[in-house]
Amino acid sequence: MSESHVKISRTIIRGTSPSTVRLESRVRELEDLLDLERDARVRAERNANEMSIQLDTMAERLDELSGTSSQTHDAIRRKDMEISKLRKDLENANAAFETAEATLRRKHNTMISEISSEVENLQKQKGRAEKDKSQLMLEIDNVLGQLDGALKAKASAESKLEGLDSQLTRLKALTDDLQRQMADANSAKSRLAAENFELVRANQEYEAQVVTFSKTKAALESQLDDLKRAMDEDARNRLNLQTQLSSLQMDYDNLQARYEEEAEAAGNLRNQVAKFNADMAALKTRLERELMAKTEEFEELKRKLTVRITELEDMAEHERTRANNLEKTKVKLTLEIKDLQAENEALAAENGELTHRVKQAENLANELQRRIDEMTVEINTLNSANSALEADNMRLKGQVGDLTDRIANLDRENRQLGDQLKETKSALRDANRRLTDLEALRSQLEAERDNLASALHDAEEALKEMEAKYVASQNALNHLKSEMEQRLREKDEELENLRKSTTRTIEELTTTISEMEVRFKSDMSRLKKKYEATISELEVQLDVANKANANLNRENKTLAQRVQELQAALEDERRAREAAESNLQVSERKRIALASEVEEIRSQLELSDRARKNAESELNDANGRISELTLSVNTLTNDKRRLEGDIGVMQGDLDEAVNARKAAEDRADRLNAEVLRLADELRQEQENYXRAETLRKQLEIEIREITVKLEEAEAFATREGRRMVQKLQNRVRELEAELDGEIRRAKEAFANARKYERQFKELQTQSEDDKRMILELQDLLDKTQIKMKAYKRQLEEQEEVSQLTMSKYRKAQQQIEEAEHRADMAERTITIKRTIGGPGSRAVSVVREINSVSRGNRATSIM
């Protein structure tokens, strides 16, 4: 019993279908019926043996009483006829039992073969379910791997953000260097141009990094979309599990309803037993009344037994032997009663087993409900974690957007600075021509450049070390989020301070440059009067050309960004198309799997139809068996009637013996006791007949219950089959709708890809036109520069007068660059030379002002 419970619980845990459980219960019922038939056959054989013994005793008795009278001969003939009939009935019963046993064996073998085939099919379904489970586990592992990759990508993005912060600090340092070098801009044209070129290149690199960051951002968004799809698939799997659980709950409700029906049937049987006991009590009272009447008749006929009492003593001895035989039959019947009691106890034990199974099923249902609650809690936690990750992702996206805005602001400020530098260059171009002798500053600036390069290299090494430290501290990322936010706030404040400081420095530079321009204009106004109009016109043209060139560069950059965005969108569309194709393949595989499931369900329906037909055939066989049992019961009733006739004949003989012999009252009393014993035996025979009737009724009730259960099983199978077919049809419709949607999305993606390709081609043509315009403007710029060179040569020819003063200025500047601690001596020599040469006084004052400005800038840089 415990093993059977363990098997049942194991099958429920593994998710066996209710059809297998019903088939197993049906097999058990058939085995129980087979055991009952075997027991009935054993009892029938036992009864046949007892009847043969009784027939032998009766034959011996007939042989002994052969010479009594013609009545005895007639009785012997009747008994011989009855014996032959009984033998024929026994042979027929044996043949019927053998045929029934053979048919039952054949049916049992066919049922076992069908059940084995169904068990094999169920094992195949189990293997498929395990394969599906392994595939789901692999998919879950892949999703976890993708999640780890997304987290790593997130960590790398944050490390890149820190790298951008470090780059911003470097940009701050570079802007500080630019601020320090802006004081020397009037004397370092070539150096400033080279540094501007380097800054533009660094800016382009930063823009390329921003593009790479945008690509990584798009990749992260695609990974997030994949994760969302995986979560949707997990939700669908959970819905499937919930549907399976609901089906299991329905099966449990059906089993509970059947158990209640069986309990009601047991109550009905108890009511019938009570009614039968009441009928037996009424029959007992009626028989007792008849017995009292017969005893009164016996007392009336007792007087007539005095004559034949001597003749009937031998018959009384024979009756004693028969009474002994009847006592033996009584013992056997008591054994049968004990067997029936044992069967009743077995039925009670089976009822207890059924209640235990129901309790186990309830416990399993509670465990499944608990598991479902745990799964729902886990799903809620996963959803909350997913929402937190999405919030973090949105926050990071906002931070990246802020950084891109800040970088764009810095780019705009850099462009403004470049424009201002161009304006200062155009304003100071004439002065820079005259200050070409300041090449000695070049070596110092190169040394400073080397120092800056070494400092930049050191900063890059420090950046690498910081990146290594960040990789080492990736595991503590969750604890450092608050610190990162504080750092970002500090960076924002630093950027604001930097912007304010740059604006202040730019204003100071503009003021100093304006002052220097005023000074140089006051100094050079005498030399520029002739060519001022032409130079102003050329400067206006040059500014217009520079602005057009800058606008074209901006448009080129915007077009390049647009092209990159279109390429990224095209790549996204390609990825979406690939994802749609993969989803299409997955849906095709699901459709094939569902078609196979539909075929399996059809095969299961066919098997259930076969089982129904077999059950109907078994029902017909059981009906035939019941008819045979009714025939045997009828034969037993006929035998009972014959025995009652014999008892009546014997009572007549006893009456005659009482009339013949009145003196033997004590023997008559003994015969009366024997008659009472025979009456008790008759009562026992009647009870046996009533038991047989109750057994027949019970078999009829069981047959009705079996038919009802078969009808319920057929209705349940048809209902479940229709429900599964409808469910699968709905699933097929949903998959077809999803397939149509995916096809529509793929078509839209192809149309968008074609549209983007057309836009890309149009932008390419526009960029080519812009390049042609740029080349034309470049030609115009070259022509204007040639004109400017011609004007410059004319200015140089006019400025040959001031070469002596400029040579003195060069010597003084070289002395200042070689040794700054000799500045006082250089000033004294300049004053001496100023006293010697009058027209060079203004140049010396200009040099002194430049030196003072450079010293002030160096002091500020040191501070």
Curated annotation (Swiss-Prot):
Q: Where in the cell is it found?
A: Cytoplasm, Myofibril
Describe the function of this protein: Paramyosin is a major structural component of many thick filaments isolated from invertebrate muscles.
Give UniProt keywords alphabetically.
Coiled coil, Cytoplasm, Motor protein, Muscle protein, Myosin, Thick filament
Q: How does it assemble?
A: Homodimer.
Claim: Cytoplasm is one of the keywords in the record: yes
Report the coiled-coil segments.
19-836
Task: Tell whether Cytoplasm is among the UniProt keywords.
Answer: yes
Positions of the region Nonhelical region?
A: 1-18, 837-863
Q: Which SUPFAM superfamilies match?
A: Myosin rod fragments
- Say which species the protein is native to: Taenia saginata (Beef tapeworm)
**Gene3D superfamilies tied to this protein:** 1.20.5.340, 1.20.5.370, Vasodilator-stimulated phosphoprotein (1.20.5.1160)
Protein's name according to its UniProt entry: Paramyosin
Q: Which GO terms describe its cellular component?
A: myofibril; myosin complex; myosin filament
Describe the family membership recorded for this protein in Swiss-Prot or TrEMBL: Belongs to the paramyosin family.
